[in-house]
Structure formats: structure tokens, C-alpha cells
Amino acid sequence: MASGGGGGGGMEAVEVRFRLDDGSDIGPSMHDQATTVTALKEFVLARWPQGKEIAPRTVNDVTIINAGQVLENNRTLAESRNLAAESPEGPITMHVVVRRSRPERRVKQPPKARPPERIGCGCTIL
């Protein structure tokens, strides 16, 4: 098995291919159905192709989508599968999205308060 993530309990392994945003793939590879989505993300992160312009730094930078559904980290592969959308032959293709790291924002300091302008009033005493 390519990755673990819990007791197998006799579940059949599943062949998964991870499709990257440029159309290239990681895999296909076999994964136990008890494997968590977090473990799948770690698998993808460890095998990320070198030299890509956008690369994840942590599992939090990676989102995996299967059959149009974003997979939750704490769920297993068995819980995340959509049998109606899968082909009986060949690997399951899961899409990998990398969230671009946001540049650190500098906190804008509020502009310095200017003293209120004096609005003059002309009074004439007769």
C-alpha cells in the first residue's frame, strides 16, 4: 500500500491518481480505504514534482477534490468516495488544488489626525 492511515479491517485497496492544475499526474498508486485525507495530502506533498512554479509547503496548502466535492481532512478515503461517479475500471482521479500563500499584509496605520480647521466667523458690533 502506498499510504496508511488507520486499521485496514480487510477493506480493498483503491487505485488513485492525483491530477495537478497543469494536467500532470502523481500516481496512480494504491491506497487503503482507511487512509485519511490528511495522509493523502502528505503523500501528494512528498511526491510534488520539482520545478513547479506553484508548490505547496504544508498539507494546509493542499485541497483534494473528488467528483466535485472538497474532501475533509479527518475523513477516510472510504468515506470520501463517490461510487456513482467512479469508473469500475481504472484509477479514481482526484484533483489537487494549491492555495497560493497570501503575502503578509502590513497593517495600515490610520492617518494622523489633523487638528480641526477653524472656521472663522466674522462678527460686527455696531
UniProtKB/Swiss-Prot annotation:
In terms of SUPFAM superfamilies, this protein maps to: Ubiquitin-like
Q: Which residues form the Ubiquitin-like domain?
A: 14-79
Q: Give the membrane topology.
A: Lipid-anchor
Sorted alphabetically, which keywords does the UniProt record give?
Cell membrane, Lipoprotein, Membrane, Methylation, Prenylation
- Locate the Cysteine methyl ester modifications and list their residues: C123
Subcellular location as annotated: Cell membrane
Could you name the Gene Ontology cellular component terms for this entry? Answer: plasma membrane
Residues with S-geranylgeranyl cysteine lipidation? Answer: C123
Q: Does the keyword section mention Electron transport? A: no
- Report the leader peptide range: none
Stretches that traverse the bilayer: none
Top-rank taxon, per record: Eukaryota
Q: Which InterPro entries match?
A: MUB, Ubiquitin-like_domsf, UBL3-like, UBL3-like_ubiquitin_dom
Q: Which residues form the propeptide?
A: 124-126
Q: Main role?
A: May serve as docking site to facilitate the association of other proteins to the plasma membrane.
Q: Could you identify this protein by its name? A: Membrane-anchored ubiquitin-fold protein 2
Question: Which source organism does the UniProt entry give?
Answer: Oryza sativa subsp. japonica (Rice)
